[in-house]
From Swiss-Prot:
PANTHER family associated with the record: AQUAPORIN TIP3-2-RELATED (PTHR45665:SF23), AQUAPORIN-8 (PTHR45665)
Membrane topology (UniProt): Multi-pass membrane protein
Taxonomic source organism: Oryza sativa subsp. japonica (Rice)
InterPro entries associated with the record: Aquaporin-like, Aquaporin_transptr, MIP, MIP_CS
Bilayer-spanning residue ranges: 28-48, 62-82, 105-125, 149-169, 176-196, 224-244
Entry protein name: Probable aquaporin TIP3-1
Protein's UniProt keywords contain Zinc-finger: no
Subcellular location: Vacuole membrane
Family stated for the protein in its record: Belongs to the MIP/aquaporin (TC 1.A.8) family. TIP (TC 1.A.8.10) subfamily.
């Protein structure tokens, strides 16, 4: 698993200037780019393929199929990246880890750029390989207000970030760490079953950004940034400061040690 889980957190840090060109930072960014592209291609592709097979996708069976595809795709994406970059595959997860002091701001910026580019490239590849099918994007269901959706996105992403912290970052995760990709992936799928009919269950700004840019659909787009960032940020702070004992997070009486270049 990621060495990030064994590193002390507890303090927001900008990072050192050399972090921007350090090979570990570049490798981690490439890992996030590829993992996010893998996830978005399979996730968005499952929706496009369902639309190809059936005229009406808004059925219980369709929701289950798309949720399962998202769950499995995220599990694989996290698994292939967790030992290199921490397997965030989500700007909101990166934000939660940043607030918890688990990576520097410089590295977080590289992660965000890589994740967004990965989502855009995956969506473009889907449009190219499907003969120009337009990605459906995300939208609010009838009767769902903007702030209802923000709260829903925050709640679902809070759970996702909490699960990530518990299975990937927590120093005492033990053997639970071996199921981290499945735990995070299955929770994403479960949240899609719960929230999909209301706002599409984004939980991942990169996942929403790719189809929005390629399909040029920006209505309510801010909802899928604000909600996940608030939820992930709260979960990261809660787990870092209330769940992880201070002795595990910061040795020598809580003294902070600067993040090493290999930290995620």
């Amino acid at each position: 698993m990621s060495t990030a889980a064994a590193r002390p957190g507890r303090r927001f840090t900008v990072g050192r200037s050399e972090d921007a060109t350090h090979p570990d930072t570049i490798r981690a960014a490439i890992s996030e780019f590829l993992a996010t592209a893998i996830f978005v291609f399979a996730a968005e592709g499952s929706i496009l393929s369902l639309g190809k097979l059936y005229q009406d996708m808004s059925t219980p069976g369709g929701l289950v199929a798309v949720s399962l595809a998202h769950a499995l795709a995220l599990a694989v994406a996290v698994a292939v990246a967790v030992n290199i970059s921490g397997g965030h595959v989500n700007p909101a997860i990166t934000f939660g880890a940043l607030l918890g002091g688990r990576l520097s701001l410089i590295r977080a910026l590289f992660y965000w750029l890589a994740q967004l580019l990965g989502a855009v490239v995956a969506t473009l590849l889907l449009r190219l390989t499907t003969g120009g099918m337009r990605p459906p994007g995300f939208a609010l269901a009838s009767g769902v207000g903007d702030w209802h959706a923000v709260l829903l996105e925050a709640t679902m992403t809070f759970g996702l970030m909490y699960a990530y912290y518990a299975t990937v970052i927590d120093p005492k995760r033990g053997h639970v760490g071996t199921i981290a990709p499945l735990a995070v992936g299955f929770l994403l799928g479960a949240n899609m079953l719960a929230g999909g009919p209301f706002d599409g269950a984004g939980m991942n700004p990169a996942r929403v950004f790719g189809p929005a840019l390629v399909g040029w659909r920006w209505r309510h787009h801010w909802v899928y940034w604000l909600g996940p960032f608030v939820g992930a940020g709260l979960a990261g702070l809660l787990y870092e400061y209330l769940v992880i004992p201070s002795a595990d997070a910061a040795p020598h009486g809580g003294a902070h040690q600067p993040l090493a270049p290999e930290d995620y």
